[in-house]
Each structure stands twice: as C-alpha cells, then as structure tokens.
Amino acid sequence: LKRVGLNRDHMSRFPHEFSGGQKQRIGIARALAVEPEFVICDEPISALDVSIQAQVLNMLKELQEEMGLTYLFIAHDLSVVKYISDRVIVMYLGTMVEFADSEELYAHPLHPYTQVLLSSIPVADPRLVREKKRIMVKGEIPSPINPKDCCRFAERCPYATEECRAKLPELREVTPGHFVACHMVK
C-alpha cells in the first residue's frame, strides 16, 4: 500500500469511501502484489482528474524504475503516451500501422494515420496553434467486423492509391527500429 501512496487506515474502508484516484492506486497495488515483471495498463488514468492523472503517471514511472517493470500502456491520450513510453505502437482498427521508439515516432511519424493523430494533440501556446498544421480525415470509420483485405485506413487516407485499396501493407522496417505498414512509405 505504501508503494502506491496509501496507508494502513485504507485497509478498513469500504469501496464507496475511496476516490477515483485511490481506487486506481488500489488496482495498481493488487497488480503489484504478485511481483510481476510485466503489467498491462489499459487506460489507467482516463477517468481521473488531470491533477490525479499526473500523480498516478509519476507513481507508475517510479514503480517502473524501482521494480524493473515493463508496461504495455494502452491509451488514447497521446501526450500521456509520449510521457510514459519508450516505444510506441500505433494501431488502426486492430492492425498495427507504425512502431518506433517514442522520440522517433513523435519527431518523424511516417504512417498517415499516425500523422493525423499527432496533428490532433492540443497545443497550449496560442502562437504555436496558428503555426501548427492540423491534418483532417474525411469519411466514416469502416466497420471492424470482417474487414477488407486491404489497408484499413485506405477509405479515409488522403494518399490512398489502388494498391492501398487492394492489398494489405506489410509492416516493414524503413529505418533502424522504425516499422510502418504503408504502401506509400518506401
């Protein structure tokens, strides 16, 4: 309990007496009780206030260093992903479209979907907002049920060709440690 910022008094409380952040800390403590090497964190901060999110993220980083943990961190908040991750996998409709070291992926996104995602990260500085190019996609997200045997992003991609609509691209290493599944990236 101490590792996750709780004390002995918390052991005698009922579930309804805990805040969202405390409940999340309890969940993390339960996961750590078996001394894992690998922890899956599926949206671990999505329902928390921003201040509590920062506390939980910092705690996760400290626990990672202290216990030598490896995380599979699943999240939609790309700023959080950048903060917590060493390597990032971007997926679209259940298919991996890009994989690289965090710094490399954020500095040089290659897949059009990754570019769209990164262009959507909010910028706090109004001067930078005017300079930032936001990439918009058109169309509806296709059904993930029985997907076509082609690029999953082709229907919405501004660069899609007939090859994209006819053939599923393979995940290829285009620079050392940077993999992308896109026919347009050579």
Language-model features: locations:
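Charged, flexible cofactor/metal-binding loops and thiol motifs
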Residues: 101-186
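Conserved ABC ATPase signature
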Residues: 14-18, 22
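P-loop NTP-binding/switch modules centered on Walker-like glycine-rich loops
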Residues: 40, 44, 48, 52-130
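Conserved ABC ATPase "signature" region
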Residues: 1-9, 115-119
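A short, proline-enriched helix->beta-strand linker immediately N-terminal to the Walker B motif
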Residues: 33-37
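Interfacial catalytic loop of ABC nucleotide-binding domains
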Residues: 12-14, 132
